[in-house]
Structure formats: structure tokens, C-alpha cells
């Protein structure tokens, strides 16, 4: 196998005509990879992605060829995938106003050019989910919000419309399934690419704790920060630490590592109904 790319979290290998996508235990916040791994994180992301790919298979095609036909040293954290020509934008859907989206709304009254009602508070539910794309930055650089017009400039109007529709369809269906299991999906990012037959296909990961914000339904209360089953916990620690959000990043304390792993395990078990390990 040939290593083609080492990303913030995943390594991509070529194996004949297929790709082997390996999820590491690395974690990144603010587009910077932290030096401290989260044990089992790669396996948890892979298992949850596979569950979601199966749940949403009738809604949108995905890149999975096999979860078992992978090198033994990568068992549990790798997927054999079809090659995709990836779209050069990050496709983001938001159903709740939080994080960078809330900060942008406070400045402008909009998110990625989408005008929103006045007076919304932190974690407010939006009237309808919105498509808020961003650039796809290299490792070490920051993704930047772009408008729908910016997507049109990059991929054309027809493809931009399809990206928006698929992203919002995935979000709505995922949010519906998760709500029935006690989880709110505040927002999520998906990556799409063209398969060899010209089909727009979901790649990378799907509705995981790295790509989404997950909140417990039972404690949801707009107007404040929410308990989260995702890497928001690490983002919050990084902000409190005084780190300037530039590389190199500080080591994570042991208690932050343990609490982060516990969150990833909890949401996997709540969503899938399966016991981890």
C-alpha cells in the first residue's frame, strides 16, 4: 500500500484501485492537530460512521466497499473505500445556532450569507436547517465560511444546488433518527465527491462526534452552552487554557482525555443501541 495523504485525523492509502481510509486517535480543534491522542477514538469514529452509512444508505450513496477487507493492523479503524473526486467545499448543515455560526450571527445577523431572524440566542433552534458551507483548508490552516454564491463560483450552480439538497437531507434524516434516541444534532459537516459513475457520494465520515455537535435532549436549554457528546469539550478546554489557536498546540490533561473518550463512547452507545467494547 502507498500512503497518499495524512490528514488531521485520517490517513489515506492506495490499495490497487481502492482506498484504505484509516481513522487515527488524533484530535484536532480550530484546525490544529493536538499532540495528545484520545484512546479508541479512531475505532469509535469508524464504527459510528459505518452505522450511519447503513442507516442513510437509501438516502445518499456512500464510499464504503468493505469494513473487514482491510490490513489487520488497521482492523476496526479502517474502511476500504471507492475513490472519489472530492468537491472542494465543506458541506455544513445547522439546525441550531452555536459555535462559529453563533459568533458570525452576532456580528452580521447571518451565517454564511443566510439571513436569520433577529434576537436568536446561543443554542437557539433555527426555523429550518440551513446550509452553511466553508472552504476546505489544508492541514494547519483554517476553514473559512463561504456563501452559497461562493459554492456556485467553485462548482457551478447545478452542483451547488445538489450539494445543498443532499447536505440538508442528510441532516434532517440524521436529526430525526437521533432525536428518537435522546440526542439533538446541532450541526454537522459532510464531505461529498464524484464517484467514477458520476454519482455524488458521501465520503470521509458521517455524523460522528468529530464532524457534528451532539446534545442530550433532556438537558437542552437555549440561551446557554450545552453539554456535548463531541469535541466541543476539547474546544472549550483549549479556549480556557489561553492557547492562541496556532500550532503547536498544548498537551491535553489526562482528565480531559478521559472525559472526551467517555463522551464519544456514550453517544455511540446511545445512537446505535450497542455496547462499546
From Swiss-Prot:
Residues that span the membrane, as ranges: none
Metabolic or biological pathway, per its Swiss-Prot or TrEMBL entry: Purine metabolism; IMP biosynthesis via de novo pathway; 5-amino-1-(5-phospho-D-ribosyl)imidazole-4-carboxamide from 5-amino-1-(5-phospho-D-ribosyl)imidazole-4-carboxylate: step 1/2
NCBIfam families the record matches: PRK13961.1, purC
Protein name: Phosphoribosylaminoimidazole-succinocarboxamide synthase
Species annotation: Salinispora arenicola (strain CNS-205)
Catalytic activity: 5-amino-1-(5-phospho-D-ribosyl)imidazole-4-carboxylate + L-aspartate + ATP = (2S)-2-[5-amino-1-(5-phospho-beta-D-ribosyl)imidazole-4-carboxamido]succinate + ADP + phosphate + 2 H(+)
InterPro entries: SAICAR_synt/ADE2_N, SAICAR_synth
EC nos: 6.3.2.6
Protein family membership: Belongs to the SAICAR synthetase family.
GO biological process: 'de novo' IMP biosynthetic process
Superkingdom of origin: Bacteria
Organism classification: Bacteria, Bacillati, Actinomycetota, Actinomycetes, Micromonosporales
Annotated gene: purC
GO cellular component, one term: cytoplasm
Keywords noted in UniProt: ATP-binding, Ligase, Nucleotide-binding, Purine biosynthesis
GO MF, any single term: ATP binding
Enzyme class: ligase
Amino acid at each position: 500500500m502507498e500512503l497518499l495523504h495524512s490528514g488531521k485525523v485520517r490517513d489515506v492509502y492506495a490499495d490497487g484501485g481502492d482506498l484504505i481510509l484509516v481513522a487515527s486517535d488524533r484530535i484536532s480543534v480550530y484546525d490544529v492537530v493536538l499532540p495528545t491522542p484520545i484512546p479508541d477514538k479512531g475505532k469509535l469514529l469508524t464504527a459510528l460512521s459505518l452505522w450511519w452509512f447503513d442507516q442513510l444508505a437509501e438516502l445518499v450513496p456512500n464510499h464504503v466497499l468493505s469494513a473487514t477487507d482491510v490490513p489487520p493492523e488497521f482492523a476496526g479503524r479502517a474502511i476500504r473505500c471507492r475513490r472519489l473526486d472530492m468537491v472542494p467545499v465543506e458541506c455544513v448543515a445547522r439546525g441550531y445556532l452555536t459555535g462559529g455560526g453563533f459568533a458570525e450571527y452576532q456580528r452580521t445577523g447571518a451565517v454564511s450569507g443566510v439571513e436569520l431572524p433577529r434576537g436568536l440566542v446561543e443554542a437557539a433552534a433555527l426555523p429550518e436547517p440551513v446550509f452553511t458551507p466553508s472552504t476546505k483548508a489544508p492541514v494547519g490552516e483554517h476553514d473559512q465560511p463561504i456563501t452559497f454564491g461562493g459554492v456556485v463560483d467553485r462548482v457551478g450552480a447545478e452542483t451547488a444546488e445538489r450539494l445543498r439538497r443532499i447536505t440538508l437531507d442528510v441532516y434532517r434524516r440524521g436529526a430525526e433518527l437521533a432525536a428518537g434516541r435522546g440526542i439533538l444534532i446541532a450541526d454537522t459537516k459532510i464531505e461529498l465527491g464524484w464517484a467514477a459513475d458520476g454519482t455524488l457520494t458521501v465520503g470521509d465520515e458521517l455524523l460522528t462526534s468529530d464532524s457534528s455537535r451532539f446534545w442530550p435532549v433532556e438537558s437542552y436549554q437555549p440561551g446557554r452552552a450545552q453539554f456535548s457528546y463531541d469535541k466541543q469539550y476539547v474546544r472549550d478546554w483549549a479556549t480556557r487554557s489561553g492557547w492562541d489557536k496556532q500550532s503547536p498546540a498544548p498537551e491535553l490533561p489526562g482528565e480531559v482525555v478521559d472525559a472526551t473518550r467517555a463522551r464519544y463512547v456514550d453517544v455511540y452507545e446511545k445512537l446505535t443501541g450497542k455496547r462499546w467494547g
